[in-house]
Amino acid sequence: MDPRLENGSFKIVDWPLSEVRLKDNVHFPWIILIPRVSSSITEIFQLSIEEQKMLMDEITKLSSCLHSHFKPTKINVGALGNIVSQLHIHVIARYEQDPCWPQSVWQANVPEKSYPTDTRDQLIHQLRALLS
């Protein structure tokens, strides 16, 4: 796993294809799916058809869980990879009152803020129960 993905996030659970991680940014419920495939895979189309289906199933399951649990205005899903090329998918619960709305989380000039330890641990516990 690219160290930039690992260092800025916390493992929640393993799914059939992907490791599911919480991004350390208190502004949003922000989950990253990191498929356990070769690091040379940088695009979704490079996955096998079966892996593509598994990834779409995981994105759908995660989006649905975040939507029902957090009640956001919108779920943002993206696979950019301009900075970290290893294939990974961002699934972010967004609210009209969040500090970046309506821009993307990358466009807005809002510094990331880490979770307080207690809040982070509690959220990881909730997400593990929700996503296991």
Regions found by a protein language model. Name each.
Residues 1-87, 91-132:
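HIT superfamily nucleotide-processing domains
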